[in-house]
Each structure stands twice: as structure tokens, then as C-alpha cells.
Regions:
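Structural signature of hydrophobic alpha-helical transmembrane segments
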Residues: 86-102, 137-146, 229-239, 282-293
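Hydrophobic alpha-helical transmembrane segments
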Residues: 50, 54, 94-98, 121-125, ...
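Active-site cofactor/substrate anionic-group-binding motifs, chiefly glycine-
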Residues: 89-123, 132, 156
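N-terminal signal-anchor module of multipass membrane proteins
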Residues: 1-97, 101
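Long hydrophobic alpha-helical segments that form multi-pass transmembrane helix bundles
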Residues: 162-243
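Membrane-interface helix-loop-helix junctions at boundaries between adjacent transmembrane segments
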Residues: 118-198
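Alpha-helical transmembrane segments
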Residues: 252-298
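C-terminal ends of transmembrane helices
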Residues: 34-40, 104-116, 152-162, 244-253, ...
Length: 298
């Protein structure tokens, strides 16, 4: 390797070593291991673990791209094929992903170089999660601001991966929700119409938004709720696709089925408690439906 000597201690590009190390360990298995302290030997490192999580996100991401397209064409009353819907959704989604990774990794590299430590691997997943929990119509400049806020305030001020007390992806969403609520809620932000005319009778409200307005849920749509072809954030509408990702995490040993099951049990029990003294449609919603609505599974 004729390049590495320039980046190691004493080389003319020594300060840029964290950036070099990030690319090297992403492409190749690291040639160094821990030397002291308690540690566990494993066949994969943290970057490979994060890549596995990214693979587990693919079912929800790909379905979300298709769902964005099919809701768009339904809203404007235009016929479509599976590929036409997917292509439209992918073209709308890719700029969000590019901005999330571009802005976030730039900040990560800046902090790593200034502090002289390795680039944290956690953003490989965070960079994908942020656009997946956003409305498809979120302005790109807002996404930039939310990513900057999430990475700096939600992560780097605490020391980086493993030391942050806030979830960076949820921090980005919470920031936009409180700073620009009109762009993060309502019945118009979840479906991209390219400013076209919406057909009569079409509503872009999410099922939970209808329930919050005391509109009973249509029980004939339970199948759609589970499959996910309903309005909502890009990656969180399809419980089916999310469960496919969970299977990948469990099969590879990255995720614990006990942890996942406990979350669903806890959510189900809490929903039953609300059912006991339900005073509105949202609290009266059957407990099992809470598990497939509102991005709970995601």
C-alpha cells in the first residue's frame, strides 16, 4: 500500500488519517484489533454490523418508494404500473437520501478529523433512517437543517456513537416537527402531487390523523394497513416489509427477538389499557391495530 504511509503518524497527511481509515475499513476488513480491556472476538466489525442493518432496512425502503409513486398516481387519477410507481418514488426519494448522507457524513468527517479519532460507523444507519421517517414532500433545505441539528446536537455533543443519549434520526424528525409543524403534519404532506389537481374524494390523511379527528377507522382496510399502501412517512407504513427486515436482523444475530417481542407486548398491553376507558376513536381502536399503524413497528 503506497498511499497509507502518507496518512499514518509522521506522514504529510497525518491529520486526514480518520478520513482515510473510514474509507479503508469500509472497503476492507480492518488489520487491527483491541489489545487490552474486555472485548468479544467476532467475525464482523461494527461497520459490517451497520451494513447488515442497512440491508434489513431495504424491504421497507423499496416498498416505501413504490408506495410514494402509487399514492401519487392515485391522487391525480392517473393509471400506473408497478415499475412506473416505483421509478417515480425512487426519483423522489434518492435526493433525500443523498442529502442525508452528504450533509451528515461531512459533519462526521469534520468532527473526526478535528478530534483525531475514527469516523463513527453509526451514521451508516442514521443516514438512511432520517429520510425514511420524513414526509416525501419535506423541503430539501429543511432536511439539511434537521440533519445538521441531529448530528451535532443529538450525537456529537455527547461524544459520538455509543455515547449519545438521543436517537439522531428521531432528533431530526422532532426538530422539524416542532420548528416547522405545518410541513410535518396534516393531510397534504404525505403525498407528492407535483402541484397537480387531486381527484375528487381523495384524502391524504393518515389513519391515525382520521382517528385523532374522531373519524372511525374503516375495518375493511386492515389488509392495507398491514401491507402499508396508505399515507405516512416513507419507510414506516408497511408492517409487512418491516417484519421482513426484523427477520433478517434475527437470522443474522444482529437483533434480538426477545427485545422486539417485548416492544410489541408492551405496546399491546398499553393499547388494552386505553381501550378500557376509551373516550374517543383513537383510544377505542382495537389493540392489535395499534401495532400496525402509525409506524409503531418501525
Amino acid at each position: 500500500n503506497t498511499v497509507k504511509p502518507h496518512f499514518i503518524k509522521g506522514g504529510k497527511l497525518e491529520r486526514m488519517y480518520p478520513a482515510y481509515d473510514a474509507f479503508e475499513t469500509f472497503l476492507f476488513v480492518p488489520d487491527h484489533t483491541t489489545q487490552k480491556g474486555s472485548h468479544i472476538r467476532d467475525a464482523i466489525d461494527l461497520k459490517r454490523t451497520m451494513i447488515t442493518v442497512l440491508i434489513a432496512l431495504m424491504p421497507a425502503l423499496l416498498f416505501g418508494m413504490w408506495n410514494v409513486g402509487q399514492l401519487h398516481f392515485i391522487a391525480i387519477g392517473e393509471s400506473f404500473t408497478l415499475m412506473k410507481a416505483f421509478t417515480y418514488g425512487a426519483l423522489k426519494m434518492l435526493p433525500l437520501i443523498a442529502i442525508s448522507y452528504g450533509v451528515g457524513l461531512s459533519i462526521e468527517f469534520t468532527f473526526a478529523i478535528s478530534r483525531g479519532h475514527s469516523v463513527n460507523e453509526g451514521y451508516l444507519v442514521t443516514g438512511m433512517l432520517i429520510p425514511m421517517i420524513m414526509p416525501i414532500d419535506v423541503p430539501l433545505w429543511m432536511l439539511v437543517v434537521s440533519v445538521i441539528f441531529a448530528v451535532i446536537i443529538g450525537k456529537e455533543v455527547f461524544g459520538g456513537t455509543g455515547m449519545n443519549i438521543l436517537n439522531p434520526a428521531l432528533t431530526a424528525r422532532a426538530f422539524l416537527f416542532f420548528a416547522y409543524p405545518s410541513f410535518m403534519s396534516g393531510d397534504k404532506v404525505w403525498i407528492n402531487t407535483d402541484n397537480g389537481t387531486v381527484v375528487n374524494g381523495f384524502s391524504g390523511a393518515t389513519p391515525l390523523a382520521d382517528l385523532a379527528a374522531n373519524i372511525p377507522v374503516d375495518m375493511s382496510l386492515i389488509g392495507s394497513f398491514f401491507l402499508g399502501n396508505i399515507p405516512g412517512s416513507i419507510g414506516e407504513t408497511s408492517t409487512f416489509a418491516i417484519l421482513l427486515g426484523a427477520v433478517i436482523l434475527i437470522f443474522t444475530g444482529i437483533g434480538s427477538w426477545r427485545t422486539m417481542l417485548s416492544v410489541f407486548i408492551g405496546g399491546y398491553i398499553m393499547s388494552l389499557l386505553f381501550n378500557l376507558w376509551g373516550i374517543n376513536e383513537l383510544m377505542l381502536l382495537p389493540a392489535h391495530l395499534h401495532l400496525i399503524l402509525g409506524g409503531f413497528a418501525f
